[in-house]
């Protein structure tokens, strides 16, 4: 019996210790921060995996699947390559004098005129693409003693034989092909592009039938350059019924310079010039459909948004585009360190502060207060510290975009087979640039994430220290982000602490008096829950023993009878 009395007193003492925290003479005030059940993992300088409440994806990994025609002027090449449109292939006549920001070449494009080759195809294609126009000005060249406007069955224009509309095929007149010597000055204030060619017959007989001389020659000169081409007579693989070829060349004539053409045969003469413009027009191979929409950035896969600093859709881009990197995802922390709230807090559901964990459900701020006093419990956000953290984080994404978005385009690189080593070197340089930017992106984002987490932790600590300085000796730091206030603190008192108007002198005497009274017989809070559980278990055990003893005593007295039937 004495044992039961002692344990009952011990249980009551522990129970009264818990209740003493919530009596009318004390209060508990905790500081905490926002938390979510499932956060987002980000990378920092010191930790590859740290959970935050919120993060923004920085890598654009998908396209719209279509090319937007605004704000860039897109010219759909359909079944015409840019060079075919330049030369005037009959099925490309619709592109005469067209302009563009981006010329889109399709995989289905084809040539449908006299078979030709361009020894410096990539340079000519790039030159015309960057000019952004096929504006053509016809000039009055004088070709005396030869037949003009030659045609071929390989280049039908309507029902009859035709030829490239921007070129003039010259052949003998009668039995003569005199030496041609024609000049054309550039008296304008812009560059002029002249496109011309050399015809390569398949046999010597064909050479003399067309040009009389057994071997022709074409020389095109300016003050800055000279090109002399000797035809290569011989049969080639058949293309559209022809084993002959035309080689296409080009010459740029600067303002004040002069074009000189000298030939004794095999000349495919220019009919005029293309007006060259300077700009940032370009060309791209893509089969993505063109649609009415708005996008600053275009890739062969389609347009992509440029609201992210990085993309891994395609290395080839046009417009103001995110930087291409290898990573498929990089997350920028836009929230604080996430510590999900514990679901249980001891036997009596005590509140706890930020040192233990965060608070879920705090929707009106990132930082705040929870209190427990004689009027109950409550919660309120601290908007000042919340706004201070948000202001420092808000500009991060825009700053990263400004550092990385390209305001120019990355064009396709093309080289002929003989320039293989140059192509390999160029590919190595491009791959190295991508590797470097991928590494830079990793470091940049990790640094920004580290800064975000540090500054949000700092705001929490600032709020805690501000509260500590207000309360002074009127409260005790409980070590978990909470203060035990040793005086009666109703809701108005709690509000004064939150808004910074608390006057500790008013409550000083009461707090000192209560502190000594409570500490005189207090049980250390770290062992309270253990004592309560042990006391409860022993009490239950003793209750069972007493009940069993009562049953045995009743059986002996005959008050309870137990019959066992077999």
Curated annotation (Swiss-Prot):
Pfam families: Hemagglutinin
Transmembrane segment boundaries: 531-551
Subcellular location: Virion membrane; Host apical cell membrane
Membrane topology: Single-pass type I membrane protein
SUPFAM superfamilies: Influenza hemagglutinin (stalk), Viral protein domain
Site location (Cleavage): 345-346
Sites where a glycan is attached: 24, 38, 54, 181, 301, 499
Entry PTM: Palmitoylated.
Main localization of the protein described in the UniProt heading: virion
CC per GO annotation: host cell plasma membrane; membrane; viral envelope; virion membrane
Lipidation (S-palmitoyl cysteine): 555, 562, 565
UniProt GO BP: clathrin-dependent endocytosis of virus by host cell; fusion of virus membrane with host endosome membrane; fusion of virus membrane with host plasma membrane; viral budding from plasma membrane; virion attachment to host cell
Segments on the Extracellular face: 17-530
Swiss-Prot/TrEMBL keywords: Clathrin- and caveolin-independent endocytosis of virus by host, Clathrin-mediated endocytosis of virus by host, Disulfide bond, Fusion of virus membrane with host endosomal membrane, Fusion of virus membrane with host membrane, Glycoprotein, Hemagglutinin, Host cell membrane, Host membrane, Host-virus interaction, Lipoprotein, Membrane, Palmitate, Signal, Transmembrane, Transmembrane helix, Viral attachment to host cell, Viral envelope protein, Viral penetration into host cytoplasm, Virion, Virus endocytosis by host, Virus entry into host cell
Residues in the Cytoplasmic compartment per record: 552-566
Keyword Transferase: no
Segment forming the signal sequence: 1-16
Similarity annotation: Belongs to the influenza viruses hemagglutinin family.
Subunit structure: Homotrimer of disulfide-linked HA1-HA2.
Chain's role: Binds to sialic acid-containing receptors on the cell surface, bringing about the attachment of the virus particle to the cell. This attachment induces virion internalization of about two third of the virus particles through clathrin-dependent endocytosis and about one third through a clathrin- and caveolin-independent pathway. Plays a major role in the determination of host range restriction and virulence. Class I viral fusion protein. Binds to sialic acid-containing receptors on the cell surface, bringing about the attachment of the virus particle to the cell. This attachment induces virion internalization either through clathrin-dependent endocytosis or through clathrin- and caveolin-independent pathway. Plays a major role in the determination of host range restriction and virulence. Class I viral fusion protein. Responsible for penetration of the virus into the cell cytoplasm by mediating the fusion of the membrane of the endocytosed virus particle with the endosomal membrane.
Name the UniProt record assigns to this protein: Hemagglutinin
Organism of origin: Influenza A virus (strain A/Mallard/New York/6874/1978 H3N2)
Gene: HA
